[in-house]
Amino acid sequence: MPELPEVETVCRGLNRLTLEQTIGGGEVLLDRSLAYPVSVEDFQKQITGCRLVGWQRRGKYLLGELRSNQAPGPAGWLGCHLRMTGQLLWTERDQQRPRHTRVVLHFEGGWELRFVDTRTFGKVWLLPGDRPWAEVMTGLGQLGPEPFGADFTAEYLYEKLKSSRRPLKNALLDQRLVAGLGNIYADEVLFFCGFHPTMASNQVSLQDCELIHQQIQATLTAAIEAGGTSFSDYRQVTGINGNYGGMAQVYGREGEPCRHCGTVIAKIKLGGRSAHFCPQCQPKLER
């Protein structure tokens, strides 16, 4: 699943390529990819004649602000969640569409924004301008702070973790704790901290949380600078891969030697998700 660095990379690409261009129409090729409005006809009618004036990211959600060419003021928001296999691709109209194209926006000048999704878990919303986002995209209201936000601090982490017995890896995946962190970067953060993924959350000290906070920000920054990770379906808006995969320390490297000590990287199941770690660099400690 695309995580914060991948979604942020897509957001920056959309801000670079799609702004101030009029949407000439839209197609919904798979009805269930459209979460709101329910009617495809309403979606097509409402989005035609609008232009995108800016994109932002919240957790793993994308939100594009729409303005109408016919009336002043906000016209609404275009929302998207890529889920497991979603892609947003900016491409010329005469290029062949991928097989799993689900929603298409037609722009003036012969360009299209295509929502491509193999497994069909991703969603697109057209949000009214006069309603709070979270009323329609209910998942937004459940998100914790952004990793780079002022309210995400080591002290906040410590208060949230100190009374929980959940494995630390599982806690970091909880979007209510911190928005946007997922399986790839939780593994990487724990490696850089030297913490075993099964370590109980209530075993961390405030000093540990300072390290976790630091490594979350550092790891996500490095991944954003690399354009994200392309292990499977993720692509940037121009269709190219992200480059962080070759920099990964543990994720996706089970059976390979640790880049720091040479110990074979291990993989376990933890709460229905995989966890990759170095048994030497991340020993399981009894505290």
Curated annotation (Swiss-Prot):
Zinc finger (FPG-type): 249-283
Membrane-spanning ranges: none
Catalysed reaction equations from the record: Hydrolysis of DNA containing ring-opened 7-methylguanine residues, releasing 2,6-diamino-4-hydroxy-5-(N-methyl)formamidopyrimidine; 2'-deoxyribonucleotide-(2'-deoxyribose 5'-phosphate)-2'-deoxyribonucleotide-DNA = a 3'-end 2'-deoxyribonucleotide-(2,3-dehydro-2,3-deoxyribose 5'-phosphate)-DNA + a 5'-end 5'-phospho-2'-deoxyribonucleoside-DNA + H(+)
Cofactor note: Binds 1 zinc ion per subunit.
Pfam families xref list: Fapy_DNA_glyco, H2TH, zf-FPG_IleRS
Positions bound to DNA: H100, R119
InterPro entries given in the database record: DNA_glyclase/AP_lyase_DNA-bd, DNA_glyclase_Znf_dom_DNA_BS, Formamido-pyr_DNA_Glyclase, FPG_cat, MutM-like_N-ter, Ribosomal_uS13-like_H2TH, Znf_DNA_glyclase/AP_lyase, Znf_FPG/IleRS
Catalytic residues in the record: P2, E3, K60, R273
GO biological process, one term: base-excision repair
Source species, domain of life: Bacteria
EC number in record: 3.2.2.23, 4.2.99.18
Molecular-function GO term, any one: zinc ion binding
SUPFAM superfamilies hit by this protein: Glucocorticoid receptor-like (DNA-binding domain), N-terminal domain of MutM-like DNA repair proteins, S13-like H2TH domain
Cofactor section: Zn(2+)
Keywords in alphabetical order: DNA damage, DNA repair, DNA-binding, Glycosidase, Hydrolase, Lyase, Metal-binding, Multifunctional enzyme, Zinc, Zinc-finger
Function of the protein: Involved in base excision repair of DNA damaged by oxidation or by mutagenic agents. Acts as a DNA glycosylase that recognizes and removes damaged bases. Has a preference for oxidized purines, such as 7,8-dihydro-8-oxoguanine (8-oxoG). Has AP (apurinic/apyrimidinic) lyase activity and introduces nicks in the DNA strand. Cleaves the DNA backbone by beta-delta elimination to generate a single-strand break at the site of the removed base with both 3'- and 5'-phosphates.
Subunit and interaction comment: Monomer.
Family to which this protein belongs: Belongs to the FPG family.
Protein name: Formamidopyrimidine-DNA glycosylase
Taxonomic classification: Bacteria, Bacillati, Cyanobacteriota, Cyanophyceae, Synechococcales
Gene coding for it: mutM
